[in-house]
Amino acid sequence: MDSALFKTIALIGKHKNPDIVIPLLSLAEYLTDRGISVVLDSLTAAHISNSRYPILTLEEIGKQADLAIVLGGDGTMLNIARALVPFSVPLIGINQGRLGFLTDLTADTMHETLNDMLAGQFVVENRMLLTVEVTRNGESVFKELAFNDVVLHRGISSGMIELEVHINGEYVYSLRSDGLIIATPTGSTAYALSSGGPILHPGLNLMTLVPICPHTLSNRPIVIGADATIEIKVHFTTEIKIYTDSHSWFDLSEHDRVFIQRCPETIKLLHPVHHSYYRMLREKLGWSGILQKNSR
């Protein structure tokens, strides 16, 4: 990918967040001064004073923009990534949220960093997604994409749910628990991590299945290849919901079947050349620094 392709850049901010207005307009002016055409997402533009830049829907952005810069947190980045994945528009994230696992630029240094990135000094990272489909009596009743994870959860019910898990047509285990998380490497640092799952490097083509509060302690997280097909059969339950990225949800019924597999498309993230996944983990998760020897 060459930076000369970035003739039109879309700016997308966290909706209804006044904190993004000043950095977004500053960024728009910075890009315009460099001869780049700037367009704004329609929902973002609805909350700022704008009479200068064209306003497009996300679908129009997908068809017209060479790059999308997202100002917000990981939640905003997840939503925009899912919407733009059919168009293969690369994304740069500027963190205006809390942790910022996906948004690694800061508003304070974005101009300096973008100088290098727009000159072609960046690294491309392709992130995998999941497709999930629910069938009921042989008919499809729910389809969605997940960038982070697919979660089956008991909702507000006090009882456990019962699931039967198959991988590539082979029975793996039955599970009585509060739920089950199926996470991508991107999602391995989200809900799956807080439920005891492993951290997966985003360059790996893997998925992890992480039980939520299992009744049997031997039900541990497992890691499988991304080319696998997961089938989950829903057994007796009072209430169970399926969530994708905590965004879309659907009520499941007994005997429903859930099919999860890797999406053929990927999300293209652009990082500065000095980006380090391990440094990011240290900073976001508060890991200790290098041990120093005592000098005596």
Curated annotation (Swiss-Prot):
The keyword NADP applies. NAD(+) binds at residues 74-75, 148-149, 176, 178, 189-194. Its EC number is 2.7.1.23. Its cofactor is a divalent metal cation. It catalyses: NAD(+) + ATP = ADP + NADP(+) + H(+). Keywords: ATP-binding, Cytoplasm, Kinase, NAD, NADP, Nucleotide-binding, Transferase. Its main location: cytoplasm. SUPFAM superfamilies: NAD kinase/diacylglycerol kinase-like. InterPro entries: ATP-NAD_kinase_N (IPR017438), ATP-NAD_kinase_PpnK-typ_C (IPR017437), NAD/diacylglycerol_kinase_sf (IPR016064), NADK (IPR002504). Involved in the regulation of the intracellular balance of NAD and NADP, and is a key enzyme in the biosynthesis of NADP. Catalyzes specifically the phosphorylation on 2'-hydroxyl of the adenosine moiety of NAD to yield NADP. This is NAD kinase. It comes from Nitrosomonas europaea (strain ATCC 19718 / CIP 103999 / KCTC 2705 / NBRC 14298).
